Amino acid sequence: MSTASVPLPNWINYGLIPILNLVVAFLISGFVVWVIGESPLDALSLLIQGALGNGEGIGFTLYYATSFIFTGLSVAVAIHAGLFNIGSEGQAYVGGLGCALVALALDRYVPWYVTMPIAVVGAGLFGAAWAFIPAFLQAKRGSHIVITTIMFNYIGAALMVYLLVHVLIVPGKMAPETRTFLEGGQLPKLGWIMQLFGAKLGAAPFNVSFIIALVVSYLVWLLVWRTKLGFEMRTLGVSPTAAAYAGIPYARTVIIAMLLSGALAGMMALNPVMGSSARLQVEFVGGAGFVGIAVSLMGRNHPLGIIVAAILFGILYQGGDWISFEMPNITREMILVIQGLVILFAGALEYMFRPAMVRLYQQFKRG
């Protein structure tokens, strides 16, 4: 019997195994830091100080985490239906277009709290539309969802570059970006949260999209574990054969799951587009779609776990920037290596310790 199918207590499956993966990732990262002549303990101290040492650092950490929550949820919803959506990056790009079009159309006439829900819908619809073709090809033609979503990442990026360079660019400007949104198209910062703890947000773009991400996380939990559609998705993900015998329509479930996944990825655009830069720019996603894969796997595809994992990766991103600033020998490329190791052990090697844990747990039960 495969160890992957052996049930383990939640404290092992959702607690101990991810912690072991993280410890190994940080040990190897520490070795890399030591090899290049720096102190691993000093680097760890700078990582924590940069990400959590003051209100501005915490603000940046939660800003990054907000994007990762959306993309992590996007990946998780698809995984529950047995689909591996690698297209969150492209879906977030196209979702940014929907978000920006709403902001550009309404920012002159209504306040941000009117623009925001319409922008959420616009970003979600555009992201879902970009996921529809891969979903249709998987459901109706048998095309592999991994291949088609990867291809659509590149198509989406190219489409955004074309639109920003030739259509949406401000006349007379060289920068490929839209005009800056007026106040009605900008999400307010959450500096008041930092003030509750006696800290200042500073220049951090931590904004109200974080609250939206938490609300959406709860709604995803309700959908997946408390609705008929969620049950059908999980059944299809666990056993397509059982789903077929139960009369669960394969094509409909696949398409709906991918539409939801694409919509969640598209909503990620609210954070950088309306919450930070207040305009649509090239490459605003910044790899968040791919980080969402590791966030989802590390969080065991559960919204609560995804929130925790997203904050961890927010710490890595913000703390990594601080390390590269304070330790010149550790370049930005080295920080990417450290982040990559965490992604490797949290995502690709998430079951590395599981066989040993299964054997130890079974011996303990027999003993």
Model-found features: residue ranges?
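Membrane-interfacial amphipathic/re-entrant helices at transmembrane-helix boundaries
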Residues: S2-T71, Y113-V114, I118, A203
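Short, non-helical or kinked segments that cap or interrupt transmembrane helices
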Residues: E38-D42, I79-G98, A139-T148, E232, ...
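Cytosolic-side transmembrane-helix boundaries in multi-pass membrane proteins
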Residues: M1-V24, G30, V238, Y245-R252, ...
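Transmembrane helix-bundle core of multi-pass membrane transporters
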Residues: T149, N153-V224, R279, M334, ...
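Single transmembrane alpha-helix segments in multi-pass membrane proteins
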Residues: F31-I36, L46, A51-L106, V120-S143, ...
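Short loop segments and helix-boundary regions at transmembrane helix junctions
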Residues: S5-L16, I79-S88, P111-V120, G124-G185, ...
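Transmembrane alpha-helical segments in multi-pass inner-membrane proteins
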Residues: L259-G340
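Helix-loop-helix "hairpin" substructures at the membrane interface of multi-pass membrane proteins
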Residues: M194-R279, P303-L304, V308
